[in-house]
């Protein structure tokens, strides 16, 4: 199973979520997690974020600023940090829609449709989770499902809050990704 975690520049939120998912999925065979940005490029990690990571006993698996490209379109699940970023990716690549969610949305919808690992595959379950959605939900500016971006000017408190939120979400998501039969 391939899981992509996507934010804007791939220098803050998605690398943190990737690192947390890798930590929570340690020992689980067959799951690859990667992070990308929709506007990736060389970027540096803000100093306040590095301090927040250290205070939380975390380190990053990768910080590349790498952009989402066609080679990444074979993932089984995409978890976005914001609805606007999800919308942009789906406009560029409509085939991503059934397997693309904001991280918060995925955790919420999955809780309403718990997996039945002994009677369905991950892809079948994901189709059930997706079936209650409408494309129109991508429109608008509601940020309810967004993970707030502290940005390059964010302070230690803002990055610590982001890390705490992503830790909770990553733990929930990791529980949903484990225990599936091998293909």
PLM segments and residue spans:
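Phosphate-binding/catalytic loops
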Residues: 90-183
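Short secondary-structure boundary segments
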Residues: 82-83, 104
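Conserved active-site segments centered on acidic
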Residues: 1-75, 84-98, 171, 175-183
């Amino acid at each position: 199973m391939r899981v992509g975690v996507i934010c804007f520049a791939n220098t803050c939120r998605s690398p943190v979520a990737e690192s947390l998912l890798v930590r929570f999925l340690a020992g689980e065979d067959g799951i690859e997690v990667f992070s990308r940005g929709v506007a990736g490029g060389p970027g540096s990690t803000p100093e306040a974020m590095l301090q927040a990571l250290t205070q939380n006993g975390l380190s990053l698996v990768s910080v590349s600023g790498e952009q989402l490209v066609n080679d990444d379109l074979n993932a089984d699940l995409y978890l976005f940090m914001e609805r606007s970023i999800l919308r942009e990716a789906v406009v560029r690549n409509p085939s991503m829609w059934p397997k693309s969610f904001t991280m918060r949305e995925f955790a919420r919808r999955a809780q309403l449709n718990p997996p039945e690992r002994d009677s369905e595959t991950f892809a079948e379950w994901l189709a059930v989770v997706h079936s209650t959605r409408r494309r129109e939900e991508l429109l608008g500016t509601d940020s309810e499902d967004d993970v707030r971006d502290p940005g390059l000017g964010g302070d230690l408190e803002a990055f610590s809050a982001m890390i705490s939120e992503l830790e909770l979400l990553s733990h929930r998501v990791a529980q949903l990704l484990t225990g599936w039969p091998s293909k």
